[in-house]
Swiss-Prot record, chains A, B:
A cellular-component GO term for this protein: cytoplasm
Name of this protein: L-carnitine dehydrogenase
Keyword Lyase: no
A Gene Ontology BP annotation from the UniProt entry: carnitine metabolic process
Taxon lineage: Bacteria, Bacillati, Bacillota, Bacilli, Bacillales
Quaternary data: Homodimer.
Amino acid sequence: MKKVAVIGTGVIGNGWITRFLANGCEVVAHDPAPGAKERTIQAIENAWESVEQLGLKEGASKDSLTFVDSIEEAVKDADLIQESVPERYELKHGVLKEIDRFAHSNTIIGSSTSGIKPTDLQIGLNHPERLVVAHPFNPVYLLPLVEIVGGEATTKEITNRASVYYESLQMKPMVIEKEIEGFVADRLMEALWREALHLVNDGIATTEEVDKAITYGAGLRWAQMGPFMTFHLAGGNAGMRHMLEQFGPALKLPWTKLEAPELTDELKERVIQGCETHANDRSVEELEKKRNEFLVKLIDLVEDYWP
Amino acid sequence: MKKVAVIGTGVIGNGWITRFLANGCEVVAHDPAPGAKERTIQAIENAWESVEQLGLKEGASKDSLTFVDSIEEAVKDADLIQESVPERYELKHGVLKEIDRFAHSNTIIGSSTSGIKPTDLQIGLNHPERLVVAHPFNPVYLLPLVEIVGGEATTKEITNRASVYYESLQMKPMVIEKEIEGFVADRLMEALWREALHLVNDGIATTEEVDKAITYGAGLRWAQMGPFMTFHLAGGNAGMRHMLEQFGPALKLPWTKLEAPELTDELKERVIQGCETHANDRSVEELEKKRNEFLVKLIDLVEDYWP
């Protein structure tokens, strides 16, 4: 992959451009908004020091960027196309149809959509099979996660190829097999976000207090582990098995506006086995030691950089 | 504050003991379980290197710990009492009544409960006014957050005094004025947790994938900022105002099992004003610069410590 087209240059599109440039790609961008090019150049300028610190690939240059006046011109020779126009179905779908019309038939089109199902985006395309969702996280040039979701027309070969592409951009692709609105990461984030809005709406906490409740608590742990391994470590030596016994009943309590699933034996086993497999023979004590070393450094880091 | 009583020595109680010792307190502990003392000594041993790295207070010593055989003996001369018995109302309430009976009438009792309302815990106490929830986060000896929640009988003077106590333990106390089940931090965590269980239950993602979706994405940002400031920075120069325009409509979409509140003009303004006040005249660009410096270091740190 050498030449990448980026369609739509808002915060996300510009984040992609920076990542592509930092990884030695040649980028052709298109956005019809007045002043788009200048804003993109400024955005790259602001981000460049950070990507340099993380490490540039050979041949990486801020100058390998061209702005063109049409989608056709942007996509016609591209090896990968990244669509990042605003999150409105009609707009996105129209742009994707135009991309599809002018791109090589086997060029992968990645859509940055946060939650629209790829099957819905594939409707009416000439080559729907090469469209995947490739959903990144802000700031795109730093955060490694990208969710790869195929639609009904997408083949396994395409999601695999897409996964390899994005991995070559120093990302952590996560292929999601079952297509649902919001995919995986945004479902988790959106649950937290909606609960946070309820807390503010009900006058329980200010936005600053909600942020404080995360940054000085769970947020520190989630940087290293997600919710499952975090709870595995909170369960003492018996890990998640003990945790579910201890806090399973809380799933029935009004601790959030979100109804929990029934904690069946099957779900319990799935969660416990998942954590134990992930722990991979490392005892809770061993994992705790690693976590503690990490947290000590992270707490120092947070002190230096926030508020 | 010099002498602290800790009642209940599971993962949380032992975390408290370590924090108290690291901050130069003398600790008297009680737990009727066989082998409790040995487990506590081991837990302190495992954690001590980390608290040393974060910095011990003058006079801090692992040896300033005594185990005693009764609640009476533990609490009678204490300046602060921390209750951390298992999360079952009847058990906690019984223990708190016994603590209340033997403690000095003006000694603050902090309950580590994750979600039981302090008003419910105060029922039948001789001096209910000095009972507050002081809810910590695992690992208690490292994570700074502690939620302070008073019940109906609690005076403002007591929550203030409690707040000063916990702050002197190098913690970040957050006083929550409105008493609700789950308080603030656990409501947020529980929303994420329940959504995560739904994803696993519905076969959308494995526990490992859920964890990956957090650790390589939002988790990195949440270590430094909570959900509100994170979105403020994702909104470009117009910050949260733009973000709500862009992603407000997504609140109606099935991106989580949790119903969102109505995004009224009042709620919008509350959220926007909250973020702008917190940003405190720092532009989004300025905050982004700080965030990027932080993320570069954090990403390096995560590489070193996980998996």
